[in-house]
From Swiss-Prot:
Protein origin, superkingdom: Archaea
Subcellular location: Cytoplasm
Cellular component GO terms, alphabetical: cytoplasm
Major localization class: cytoplasm
Protein name listed in UniProt: F420-non-reducing hydrogenase iron-sulfur subunit A
Keyword match Oxidoreductase: yes
EC number, UniProt record: 1.12.99.-
Binding of Ni(2+), residues: 61, 64
Family: Belongs to the [NiFe]/[NiFeSe] hydrogenase large subunit family.
Source organism: Archaeoglobus profundus (strain DSM 5631 / JCM 9629 / NBRC 100127 / Av18)
Keyword Ribonucleoprotein assigned: no
Gene behind the chain: mvhA
MF terms (GO), sorted A to Z: nickel cation binding; oxidoreductase activity
Alphabetic keyword roster: Cytoplasm, Metal-binding, Nickel, Oxidoreductase
Self-association and partners: The F420-non-reducing hydrogenase is composed of three subunits; MvhA, MvhD and MvhG. It forms a complex with the heterodisulfide reductase (Hdr).
Protein backbone atom coordinates (compact mmCIF):
# COMPACT_ATOMS: atom_id res chain seq x y z
CA UNK A 1 0.00 0.00 0.00
CA UNK A 2 1.44 3.36 -1.06
CA UNK A 3 1.67 6.16 1.48
CA UNK A 4 1.67 9.93 0.93
CA UNK A 5 2.80 12.18 3.78
CA UNK A 6 2.17 15.90 4.08
CA UNK A 7 4.71 17.06 6.64
CA UNK A 8 4.89 19.65 7.91
CA UNK A 9 1.30 20.80 7.62
CA UNK A 10 1.36 24.46 6.67
CA UNK A 11 -0.36 27.64 7.81
CA UNK A 12 -1.52 26.42 11.19
CA UNK A 13 -0.28 26.74 14.77
CA UNK A 14 2.09 23.99 15.83
CA UNK A 15 3.35 20.91 14.03
CA UNK A 16 1.54 17.91 12.62
CA UNK A 17 1.36 15.69 9.59
CA UNK A 18 -1.15 14.03 7.29
CA UNK A 19 -0.72 10.40 6.24
CA UNK A 20 -2.71 9.30 3.17
CA UNK A 21 -2.81 5.60 2.26
CA UNK A 22 -3.56 4.52 -1.32
CA UNK A 23 -4.88 1.16 -2.52
CA UNK A 24 -3.36 -0.80 -5.41
CA UNK A 25 -5.29 1.27 -7.96
CA UNK A 26 -4.03 4.58 -6.58
CA UNK A 27 -7.26 5.61 -4.87
CA UNK A 28 -7.38 6.79 -1.26
CA UNK A 29 -8.06 3.97 1.19
CA UNK A 30 -7.63 6.02 4.35
CA UNK A 31 -6.19 9.26 5.68
CA UNK A 32 -5.05 10.36 9.12
CA UNK A 33 -4.28 13.70 10.71
CA UNK A 34 -1.62 13.24 13.37
CA UNK A 35 -0.41 15.66 16.03
CA UNK A 36 3.21 14.83 16.69
CA UNK A 37 3.85 17.17 19.62
CA UNK A 38 3.94 15.38 22.96
CA UNK A 39 1.28 15.87 25.61
CA UNK A 40 2.71 17.20 28.89
CA UNK A 41 1.04 20.12 30.68
CA UNK A 42 -1.57 18.12 32.59
CA UNK A 43 1.22 16.32 34.42
CA UNK A 44 3.37 19.45 34.68
CA UNK A 45 0.61 21.32 36.58
CA UNK A 46 0.51 18.82 39.44
CA UNK A 47 2.05 20.25 42.58
CA UNK A 48 1.42 23.89 41.68
CA UNK A 49 -0.68 26.18 43.91
CA UNK A 50 -3.95 26.79 42.06
CA UNK A 51 -3.41 30.57 42.05
CA UNK A 52 -0.23 30.02 39.99
CA UNK A 53 -1.97 27.91 37.36
CA UNK A 54 -3.65 30.70 35.31
CA UNK A 55 -0.28 32.34 34.72
CA UNK A 56 1.36 29.01 33.96
CA UNK A 57 -1.16 27.66 31.44
CA UNK A 58 -0.96 30.86 29.41
CA UNK A 59 2.40 29.50 28.23
CA UNK A 60 0.80 26.44 26.61
CA UNK A 61 0.45 28.54 23.48
CA UNK A 62 1.57 32.09 22.75
CA UNK A 63 -1.37 32.61 20.39
CA UNK A 64 -4.02 31.14 22.68
CA UNK A 65 -2.62 32.49 25.94
CA UNK A 66 -5.63 34.68 26.79
CA UNK A 67 -8.17 31.85 26.64
CA UNK A 68 -6.14 29.43 28.74
CA UNK A 69 -5.61 32.21 31.29
CA UNK A 70 -9.34 33.01 31.39
CA UNK A 71 -10.60 29.42 31.58
CA UNK A 72 -8.05 28.57 34.26
CA UNK A 73 -9.01 31.66 36.28
CA UNK A 74 -12.66 30.57 36.15
CA UNK A 75 -11.65 27.10 37.35
CA UNK A 76 -9.69 28.63 40.24
CA UNK A 77 -12.89 30.41 41.33
CA UNK A 78 -14.43 26.98 41.83
CA UNK A 79 -11.47 25.67 43.80
CA UNK A 80 -11.91 28.53 46.28
CA UNK A 81 -15.71 28.38 46.19
CA UNK A 82 -16.00 32.05 45.22
CA UNK A 83 -18.25 33.94 42.80
CA UNK A 84 -16.36 36.82 41.12
CA UNK A 85 -17.78 40.32 41.35
CA UNK A 86 -19.87 41.61 38.43
CA UNK A 87 -17.14 44.06 37.49
CA UNK A 88 -14.53 41.29 37.46
CA UNK A 89 -16.73 39.19 35.18
CA UNK A 90 -17.14 42.10 32.79
CA UNK A 91 -13.40 42.79 32.72
CA UNK A 92 -12.73 39.12 31.99
CA UNK A 93 -15.34 39.17 29.21
CA UNK A 94 -13.87 42.37 27.79
CA UNK A 95 -10.41 40.79 27.82
CA UNK A 96 -11.70 37.64 26.11
CA UNK A 97 -13.55 39.52 23.37
CA UNK A 98 -10.48 41.65 22.61
CA UNK A 99 -8.57 38.41 22.18
CA UNK A 100 -11.23 37.22 19.71
CA UNK A 101 -10.61 40.28 17.53
CA UNK A 102 -6.85 39.79 17.60
CA UNK A 103 -7.00 36.04 17.01
CA UNK A 104 -9.74 35.86 14.35
CA UNK A 105 -7.98 38.62 12.42
CA UNK A 106 -4.67 36.74 12.42
CA UNK A 107 -6.26 33.43 11.46
CA UNK A 108 -8.31 34.88 8.61
CA UNK A 109 -5.66 37.05 6.99
CA UNK A 110 -2.52 34.98 7.65
CA UNK A 111 -3.74 31.38 7.64
CA UNK A 112 -7.19 30.94 6.11
CA UNK A 113 -7.91 33.48 3.39
CA UNK A 114 -4.66 33.32 1.34
CA UNK A 115 -5.96 30.15 -0.33
CA UNK A 116 -9.01 31.99 -1.60
CA UNK A 117 -7.61 35.46 -2.21
CA UNK A 118 -4.24 34.47 -3.73
CA UNK A 119 -5.40 31.15 -5.20
CA UNK A 120 -5.42 27.52 -4.10
CA UNK A 121 -3.02 26.55 -6.88
CA UNK A 122 -0.82 29.63 -6.53
CA UNK A 123 2.89 29.39 -5.75
CA UNK A 124 3.24 28.62 -2.00
CA UNK A 125 5.76 31.46 -1.80
CA UNK A 126 2.91 33.84 -2.70
CA UNK A 127 0.07 32.03 -0.93
CA UNK A 128 0.54 33.76 2.41
CA UNK A 129 -0.12 37.03 4.24
CA UNK A 130 2.22 39.04 2.00
CA UNK A 131 0.61 37.63 -1.13
CA UNK A 132 -2.83 38.40 0.26
CA UNK A 133 -1.86 42.03 0.92
CA UNK A 134 -0.62 42.32 -2.67
CA UNK A 135 -4.05 41.17 -3.86
CA UNK A 136 -6.27 43.30 -1.60
CA UNK A 137 -3.96 46.31 -1.63
CA UNK A 138 -1.25 47.68 0.64
CA UNK A 139 -3.62 50.28 2.10
CA UNK A 140 -6.04 47.57 3.20
CA UNK A 141 -3.15 45.56 4.64
CA UNK A 142 -1.90 48.53 6.66
CA UNK A 143 -5.41 49.22 7.94
CA UNK A 144 -5.88 45.62 9.06
CA UNK A 145 -2.56 45.52 10.91
CA UNK A 146 -3.18 48.88 12.59
CA UNK A 147 -6.67 48.00 13.77
CA UNK A 148 -5.62 44.53 14.92
CA UNK A 149 -3.01 46.21 17.11
CA UNK A 150 -5.88 48.02 18.85
CA UNK A 151 -6.97 44.63 20.22
CA UNK A 152 -3.41 43.76 21.27
CA UNK A 153 -3.19 47.08 23.14
CA UNK A 154 -6.35 46.26 25.10
CA UNK A 155 -4.97 42.82 25.97
CA UNK A 156 -1.80 44.44 27.30
CA UNK A 157 -3.74 47.03 29.33
CA UNK A 158 -5.99 44.45 30.97
CA UNK A 159 -3.71 41.41 31.19
CA UNK A 160 -0.57 43.19 32.37
CA UNK A 161 1.47 41.80 29.46
CA UNK A 162 0.74 41.56 25.72
CA UNK A 163 1.59 37.86 25.48
CA UNK A 164 1.40 35.89 28.73
CA UNK A 165 -1.17 37.59 31.03
CA UNK A 166 -0.81 37.80 34.80
CA UNK A 167 -3.97 39.65 35.90
CA UNK A 168 -6.44 36.81 36.46
CA UNK A 169 -6.91 35.77 40.10
CA UNK A 170 -9.30 33.46 41.96
CA UNK A 171 -12.39 35.54 42.64
CA UNK A 172 -11.69 38.31 40.18
CA UNK A 173 -9.05 40.42 38.49
CA UNK A 174 -5.92 42.02 39.96
CA UNK A 175 -6.33 45.49 38.48
CA UNK A 176 -9.27 47.87 38.03
CA UNK A 177 -9.86 49.95 34.89
CA UNK A 178 -9.46 53.70 35.38
CA UNK A 179 -11.69 56.21 33.59
CA UNK A 180 -8.80 57.27 31.35
CA UNK A 181 -8.18 53.63 30.42
CA UNK A 182 -11.89 53.11 29.77
CA UNK A 183 -11.91 56.03 27.33
CA UNK A 184 -8.85 54.65 25.57
CA UNK A 185 -10.42 51.19 25.33
CA UNK A 186 -13.61 52.72 23.94
CA UNK A 187 -11.63 54.49 21.20
CA UNK A 188 -9.71 51.31 20.40
CA UNK A 189 -12.97 49.33 20.31
CA UNK A 190 -14.34 51.61 17.61
CA UNK A 191 -11.30 50.76 15.49
CA UNK A 192 -11.98 47.07 16.10
CA UNK A 193 -15.57 47.45 14.89
CA UNK A 194 -14.24 49.07 11.71
CA UNK A 195 -11.89 46.09 11.31
CA UNK A 196 -14.82 43.69 11.61
CA UNK A 197 -16.82 45.56 9.00
CA UNK A 198 -13.81 45.73 6.66
CA UNK A 199 -13.16 42.00 7.01
CA UNK A 200 -16.72 41.08 6.07
CA UNK A 201 -16.48 43.43 3.09
CA UNK A 202 -13.23 41.77 1.94
CA UNK A 203 -14.88 38.37 2.33
CA UNK A 204 -17.85 39.47 0.22
CA UNK A 205 -15.84 41.23 -2.49
CA UNK A 206 -13.21 38.53 -2.95
CA UNK A 207 -15.09 35.30 -2.22
CA UNK A 208 -18.86 35.70 -2.37
CA UNK A 209 -18.75 37.53 -5.70
CA UNK A 210 -16.59 34.77 -7.20
CA UNK A 211 -18.82 31.93 -8.44
CA UNK A 212 -16.00 29.37 -8.51
CA UNK A 213 -15.03 30.07 -4.90
CA UNK A 214 -18.65 30.00 -3.79
CA UNK A 215 -19.01 26.61 -5.48
CA UNK A 216 -15.94 25.42 -3.59
CA UNK A 217 -17.40 26.58 -0.27
CA UNK A 218 -20.58 24.56 -0.94
CA UNK A 219 -18.87 21.47 -2.40
CA UNK A 220 -19.92 18.09 -1.00
CA UNK A 221 -16.29 17.03 -0.57
CA UNK A 222 -15.85 19.91 1.89
CA UNK A 223 -19.00 19.03 3.82
CA UNK A 224 -18.82 17.21 7.17
CA UNK A 225 -22.17 16.44 8.79
CA UNK A 226 -21.69 16.18 12.55
CA UNK A 227 -23.20 17.45 15.80
CA UNK A 228 -22.15 20.77 17.35
CA UNK A 229 -21.21 22.09 20.80
CA UNK A 230 -21.13 25.73 21.91
CA UNK A 231 -22.09 28.17 24.67
CA UNK A 232 -25.18 30.38 24.85
CA UNK A 233 -26.75 32.61 27.49
CA UNK A 234 -30.24 32.15 28.95
CA UNK A 235 -31.72 33.97 25.93
CA UNK A 236 -30.07 31.55 23.51
CA UNK A 237 -27.49 34.05 22.27
CA UNK A 238 -23.84 33.14 21.84
CA UNK A 239 -21.66 34.08 24.81
CA UNK A 240 -17.93 33.48 24.80
CA UNK A 241 -17.32 33.90 28.55
CA UNK A 242 -20.19 32.19 30.35
CA UNK A 243 -23.49 30.40 29.90
CA UNK A 244 -24.91 27.00 29.02
CA UNK A 245 -22.88 24.51 27.03
CA UNK A 246 -25.38 23.26 24.44
CA UNK A 247 -25.08 20.27 22.12
CA UNK A 248 -27.21 20.01 18.98
CA UNK A 249 -27.57 17.16 16.50
CA UNK A 250 -27.00 17.23 12.75
CA UNK A 251 -30.46 18.70 12.17
CA UNK A 252 -30.13 21.45 14.78
CA UNK A 253 -32.17 19.83 17.56
CA UNK A 254 -30.89 20.34 21.11
CA UNK A 255 -29.49 17.11 22.53
CA UNK A 256 -28.35 18.39 25.94
CA UNK A 257 -27.16 21.39 27.93
CA UNK A 258 -24.89 21.51 30.95
CA UNK A 259 -22.62 23.69 33.07
CA UNK A 260 -19.30 23.11 34.80
CA UNK A 261 -18.13 19.65 35.74
CA UNK A 262 -21.32 18.10 34.40
CA UNK A 263 -19.40 17.92 31.11
CA UNK A 264 -18.24 14.48 32.25
CA UNK A 265 -21.81 13.23 31.85
CA UNK A 266 -22.04 14.34 28.23
CA UNK A 267 -18.57 14.21 26.68
CA UNK A 268 -16.39 11.10 26.50
CA UNK A 269 -12.91 10.78 25.02
CA UNK A 270 -11.55 7.86 23.03
CA UNK A 271 -7.83 7.10 22.79
CA UNK A 272 -6.42 6.16 19.38
CA UNK A 273 -2.97 4.57 18.90
CA UNK A 274 -1.80 6.92 16.15
CA UNK A 275 -2.15 10.31 17.87
CA UNK A 276 -1.28 11.98 21.18
CA UNK A 277 -4.72 13.64 21.09
CA UNK A 278 -7.94 11.94 22.23
CA UNK A 279 -11.18 11.75 20.21
CA UNK A 280 -14.18 13.29 22.04
CA UNK A 281 -17.77 12.35 21.21
CA UNK A 282 -21.28 12.79 22.64
CA UNK A 283 -21.32 10.23 25.45
CA UNK A 284 -25.03 9.41 25.33
CA UNK A 285 -24.79 8.49 21.64
CA UNK A 286 -21.82 6.15 22.15
CA UNK A 287 -18.69 5.77 20.03
CA UNK A 288 -19.66 4.92 16.45
CA UNK A 289 -16.32 5.37 14.76
CA UNK A 290 -15.08 7.95 12.28
CA UNK A 291 -18.36 8.48 10.47
CA UNK A 292 -20.39 11.59 9.75
CA UNK A 293 -24.05 11.93 8.86
CA UNK A 294 -27.26 11.60 10.81
CA UNK A 295 -26.79 9.52 13.98
CA UNK A 296 -23.06 10.16 14.37
CA UNK A 297 -21.75 10.82 17.88
CA UNK A 298 -18.94 13.08 16.67
CA UNK A 299 -19.20 16.83 17.02
CA UNK A 300 -17.45 20.07 16.12
CA UNK A 301 -16.85 23.30 18.02
CA UNK A 302 -15.75 26.79 16.99
CA UNK A 303 -17.16 29.73 15.01
CA UNK A 304 -19.45 27.72 12.74
CA UNK A 305 -20.67 25.56 15.63
CA UNK A 306 -21.54 28.64 17.67
CA UNK A 307 -23.34 30.27 14.74
CA UNK A 308 -25.32 27.05 14.23
CA UNK A 309 -26.34 26.88 17.89
CA UNK A 310 -27.15 30.48 18.84
CA UNK A 311 -27.65 33.98 17.51
CA UNK A 312 -24.96 36.64 17.68
CA UNK A 313 -25.52 38.98 20.63
CA UNK A 314 -24.75 42.26 18.82
CA UNK A 315 -26.77 43.93 16.02
CA UNK A 316 -24.30 44.21 13.12
CA UNK A 317 -22.93 40.71 13.65
CA UNK A 318 -26.46 39.29 13.90
CA UNK A 319 -27.27 40.81 10.50
CA UNK A 320 -24.08 39.32 9.01
CA UNK A 321 -24.92 35.92 10.54
CA UNK A 322 -28.40 35.95 8.98
CA UNK A 323 -26.88 36.73 5.57
CA UNK A 324 -24.60 33.69 5.89
CA UNK A 325 -27.59 31.42 6.52
CA UNK A 326 -29.52 33.00 3.64
CA UNK A 327 -26.69 32.47 1.14
CA UNK A 328 -25.80 28.92 2.21
CA UNK A 329 -29.47 27.97 2.60
CA UNK A 330 -29.18 25.73 5.65
CA UNK A 331 -28.98 25.81 9.43
CA UNK A 332 -27.06 24.10 10.81
CA UNK A 333 -24.45 24.71 8.13
CA UNK A 334 -22.22 21.69 7.50
CA UNK A 335 -19.95 23.20 4.83
CA UNK A 336 -16.58 23.37 6.58
CA UNK A 337 -15.34 26.28 4.46
CA UNK A 338 -18.10 28.34 6.09
CA UNK A 339 -15.94 28.32 9.24
CA UNK A 340 -14.01 31.18 7.61
CA UNK A 341 -17.22 33.15 7.07
CA UNK A 342 -18.43 32.48 10.61
CA UNK A 343 -15.03 33.60 11.90
CA UNK A 344 -15.45 36.94 10.10
CA UNK A 345 -18.94 37.30 11.61
CA UNK A 346 -17.54 36.65 15.09
CA UNK A 347 -14.73 39.14 14.61
CA UNK A 348 -17.35 41.86 14.20
CA UNK A 349 -19.42 40.44 17.07
CA UNK A 350 -16.47 40.47 19.48
CA UNK A 351 -15.53 44.01 18.45
CA UNK A 352 -19.07 45.25 19.06
CA UNK A 353 -19.09 43.52 22.44
CA UNK A 354 -15.78 45.16 23.42
CA UNK A 355 -17.36 48.53 22.63
CA UNK A 356 -20.48 47.71 24.66
CA UNK A 357 -18.43 46.68 27.69
CA UNK A 358 -16.14 49.71 27.38
CA UNK A 359 -19.25 51.91 27.58
CA UNK A 360 -20.65 50.06 30.61
CA UNK A 361 -20.43 52.40 33.66
CA UNK A 362 -19.77 49.43 35.97
CA UNK A 363 -16.54 48.53 34.14
CA UNK A 364 -14.55 51.14 36.14
CA UNK A 365 -15.81 50.04 39.55
CA UNK A 366 -13.00 49.32 42.05
CA UNK A 367 -14.87 46.18 43.15
CA UNK A 368 -12.77 43.77 41.10
CA UNK A 369 -12.23 40.87 43.50
CA UNK A 370 -14.46 38.90 45.85
CA UNK A 371 -13.32 37.47 49.16
CA UNK A 372 -12.14 33.88 48.86
CA UNK A 373 -14.01 31.04 50.51
CA UNK A 374 -12.80 27.67 51.75
CA UNK A 375 -10.89 25.38 49.41
CA UNK A 376 -13.41 23.01 47.81
CA UNK A 377 -10.81 20.82 46.13
CA UNK A 378 -12.22 21.07 42.60
CA UNK A 379 -12.93 23.67 39.94
CA UNK A 380 -14.04 23.68 36.30
CA UNK A 381 -13.69 26.64 33.96
CA UNK A 382 -15.44 26.52 30.58
CA UNK A 383 -15.29 29.30 28.02
CA UNK A 384 -15.52 29.63 24.26
CA UNK A 385 -12.05 30.11 22.80
CA UNK A 386 -11.93 31.44 19.23
CA UNK A 387 -11.27 27.87 18.08
CA UNK A 388 -14.11 26.44 20.17
CA UNK A 389 -15.15 25.21 23.61
CA UNK A 390 -12.28 25.14 26.12
CA UNK A 391 -12.47 23.16 29.36
CA UNK A 392 -10.04 23.44 32.29
CA UNK A 393 -10.73 21.03 35.17
CA UNK A 394 -8.55 20.92 38.28
CA UNK A 395 -8.55 18.95 41.51
CA UNK A 396 -6.53 20.06 44.54
CA UNK A 397 -5.72 19.00 48.07
CA UNK A 398 -6.95 20.92 51.13
CA UNK A 399 -4.21 23.52 50.63
CA UNK A 400 -5.13 24.31 47.04
CA UNK A 401 -2.21 22.37 45.53
CA UNK A 402 -3.13 20.78 42.19
CA UNK A 403 -3.35 16.99 42.29
CA UNK A 404 -5.01 16.41 38.92
CA UNK A 405 -5.71 18.40 35.76
CA UNK A 406 -7.74 17.76 32.62
CA UNK A 407 -7.75 20.11 29.64
CA UNK A 408 -10.04 19.65 26.64
CA UNK A 409 -9.32 22.21 23.96
CA UNK A 410 -11.00 23.09 20.67
CA UNK A 411 -8.63 21.14 18.43
CA UNK A 412 -9.25 18.07 20.59
CA UNK A 413 -13.03 18.46 20.21
CA UNK A 414 -12.55 18.83 16.44
CA UNK A 415 -9.98 16.07 16.05
CA UNK A 416 -12.32 13.42 14.62
CA UNK A 417 -14.18 15.77 12.21
CA UNK A 418 -10.82 17.08 10.97
CA UNK A 419 -9.82 13.51 10.10
CA UNK A 420 -13.09 13.02 8.24
CA UNK A 421 -12.66 16.30 6.36
CA UNK A 422 -9.13 15.41 5.27
CA UNK A 423 -10.17 11.93 4.14
CA UNK A 424 -13.11 13.26 2.11
CA UNK A 425 -10.93 15.82 0.36
CA UNK A 426 -8.19 13.28 -0.29
CA UNK A 427 -10.64 10.76 -1.74
CA UNK A 428 -12.04 13.38 -4.11
CA UNK A 429 -8.77 14.81 -5.39
CA UNK A 430 -6.35 11.86 -5.23
CA UNK A 431 -7.55 9.24 -7.68
CA UNK A 432 -6.27 6.53 -10.00
CA UNK A 433 -3.99 7.79 -12.81
CA UNK A 434 -4.01 11.34 -11.44
CA UNK A 435 -0.68 13.13 -11.01
CA UNK A 436 0.00 13.91 -7.37
CA UNK A 437 1.70 17.27 -6.94
CA UNK A 438 1.84 20.14 -4.46
CA UNK A 439 -1.06 21.99 -6.10
CA UNK A 440 -3.32 18.97 -5.75
CA UNK A 441 -2.23 18.28 -2.17
CA UNK A 442 -3.13 21.84 -1.16
CA UNK A 443 -6.76 20.98 -1.94
CA UNK A 444 -6.36 18.38 0.82
CA UNK A 445 -4.61 20.81 3.15
CA UNK A 446 -7.35 23.43 2.90
CA UNK A 447 -9.70 20.88 4.47
CA UNK A 448 -8.08 21.37 7.89
CA UNK A 449 -7.45 25.12 7.82
CA UNK A 450 -11.10 26.12 8.51
CA UNK A 451 -10.80 24.44 11.92
CA UNK A 452 -7.93 26.77 12.90
CA UNK A 453 -5.91 23.90 14.32
CA UNK A 454 -3.65 24.61 17.29
CA UNK A 455 -1.38 21.61 17.84
CA UNK A 456 0.31 23.01 20.96
CA UNK A 457 -3.04 23.49 22.68
CA UNK A 458 -4.33 20.07 21.66
CA UNK A 459 -1.27 18.20 22.91
CA UNK A 460 -0.54 20.70 25.74
CA UNK A 461 2.99 20.51 24.36
CA UNK A 462 5.91 20.54 26.75
CA UNK A 463 8.38 22.10 26.29
CA UNK A 464 6.35 23.47 23.38
CA UNK A 465 9.25 23.60 20.97
CA UNK A 466 9.75 21.85 17.64
CA UNK A 467 13.22 21.26 16.19
CA UNK A 468 13.83 24.15 13.80
CA UNK A 469 16.75 24.97 11.55
CA UNK A 470 17.12 28.26 9.67
CA UNK A 471 19.67 28.54 6.85
CA UNK A 472 20.77 32.06 5.88
CA UNK A 473 22.20 32.60 2.38
CA UNK A 474 23.82 35.72 0.92
CA UNK A 475 22.93 37.28 -2.45
CA UNK A 476 25.37 34.92 -4.20
CA UNK A 477 23.64 31.85 -2.80
CA UNK A 478 26.38 31.05 -0.30
CA UNK A 479 25.39 29.67 3.10
CA UNK A 480 26.58 32.22 5.66
CA UNK A 481 24.81 31.18 8.85
CA UNK A 482 22.89 28.29 10.39
CA UNK A 483 20.55 28.87 13.34
CA UNK A 484 19.14 25.94 15.33
CA UNK A 485 16.98 25.60 18.43
CA UNK A 486 18.21 22.06 19.10
Amino acid sequence: MKKIEIEPMTRLEGHGKIAIFLDDKGNVADAFYQIVEFRGYETFLRGLPIEEVPRTVSTICGVCRAVHHTASTKASDGVYGVEPTETAKKIRELYLNAHYVEDHCAILYALGLPDFVVGIEADPAERNLVGLIKKVGVDVGKTVLKKRFAAVKVLEMLGGKPIHPVAGLPGGWSKRITEDERKEIEALAKEMVELGELTLQVFEDVILKNEKLLELITADYYRVVVNYLGTVDDAGKVNYYDGWQVGIDTKGNEVFRFKGKDYLNYIAERVVPWSYVKMPYFKQLGWKGFVDGEGTSLYSVGPLARCNIGDMNTPKAKEAQEKMFDVLKERPIHYIMAYHWARAVELLNAAERVLELAQDPEITSPDVRAELGEVTGEGVGIIEAPRGTLIHHYKTDENGIVTDANLIVATTHNHAPINIAIKKAAQHFIQENKEINDKLLNYVEIAYRPYDICQACASHALPGRYPLEVLVYDSEGELIKTIRNF
